[in-house]
Each structure stands twice: as structure tokens, then as C-alpha cells.
A protein has these predicted regions:
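A broadly conserved amphipathic alpha-helix scaffold signal in soluble, globular proteins
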Residues: 9-12, 26, 44
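Short coil turns linking two alpha-helices in DNA-binding domains
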Residues: 24, 34-42
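Short gly/ser-rich loop at a beta-strand->alpha-helix junction or flexible surface loop bordering the NTP-binding
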Residues: 78-138
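Short acidic, hydrophobic short linear motifs in intrinsically disordered regions
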Residues: 17-30
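Short, cationic-aromatic polyanion-contact patches
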Residues: 1-5, 24, 57-77
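Short amphipathic alpha-helical interface segments
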Residues: 5-18
């Protein structure tokens, strides 16, 4: 993940878990050890689309979903893949083999949320902790 993406992730996570929407650029810069200009840069696009509202001394995550959707549209998942394999089985069968510690992502996740896939898909992505990767390899 790029630095600006870690800022977006943090803003979304804090909003979701702690219901905190008001932040300062200096506070985030200190938290991550980034420069204030890096944090400021991370807020440019979300501000343009109305996800973030900047005030003189702070900013507010105004629209959680806009930031989430924007991040999803620009995120490069391929960089975060730490294990890749091929299985000739059907998609539903592969999804059934994912260990209980795994969290579905992308199309697999959407097909569970909406009870139907948003489109045909041929890859299964999921998140899993590093210590559980061996379970996924089996």
C-alpha cells in the first residue's frame, strides 16, 4: 500500500471503529511519521470528490462511502498479493476450500453480500493473516 492509501485506510478504520471523523493533518503526520505534505497530498483527491471537507485547522471525513469507493477504484490489489496459485476447480468449489480464517475480497465478497456475483469472475481473492497462510496452501 502506498503512503496515501495508509492514510485513507486509517481514516476509514477510525471512522468505522471509533466513530471519529474529525482529524488534523499534523496529528496524522505524527501518528504515521509522515511529513505533513504527504498527508496533505493524500487529502487532495478525496476533497475534490467531496469525501473530505477541509476547515482551517482540521478536516472532516464527510462521506465515508465516497472515500471507500474512491480507494477501491484506485487500489492496486496485485501489489498486496503475497501468495498466488492456480487451481483448476470451479470458482464455488475453490471458495469453499478457503480456510475459516480467510476473509473474502473482490468478486467473492460481492457475490456473498448481494447473493449473486456482479459479473462473471475467474479469480478468488481473500485476506488471511500470515500465520494462517499454510492452511490456505493446503
Amino acid at each position: 500500500m502506498r503512503k496515501i492509501e495508509t492514510v485513507w485506510h486509517h481514516l476509514l478504520q477510525i471512522a468505522l471503529t471509533e466513530k471519529k471523523f474529525k482529524h488534523t493533518q499534523k496529528g496524522l503526520a505524527d501518528f504515521f511519521g509522515y511529513s505533513v505534505s504527504t498527508v496533505n497530498h493524500s487529502l487532495v483527491a478525496p476533497t475534490k470528490i467531496g469525501a473530505i471537507r477541509k476547515e482551517s485547522k482540521f478536516f472532516v471525513l464527510e462521506n465515508f462511502q465516497k472515500l471507500l469507493y474512491y480507494w477501491a477504484s484506485v487500489r492496486n490489489l496485485e501489489k498486496d498479493v503475497i501468495y498466488k496459485t492456480h487451481c483448476p476447480a470451479a470458482i464455488k468449489e475453490i471458495e469453499g476450500l478457503i480456510p475459516s480464517e480467510g476473509i473474502y475480497a473482490c468478486y467473492s465478497s460481492a457475490s456473498r453480500i448481494f447473493d449473486e456475483p456482479p459479473a462473471d469472475y475467474s479469480k478468488v481473492y481473500f485476506y488471511i493473516e500470515e500465520q494462517d497462510i499454510e492452511k490456505a496452501k493446503q
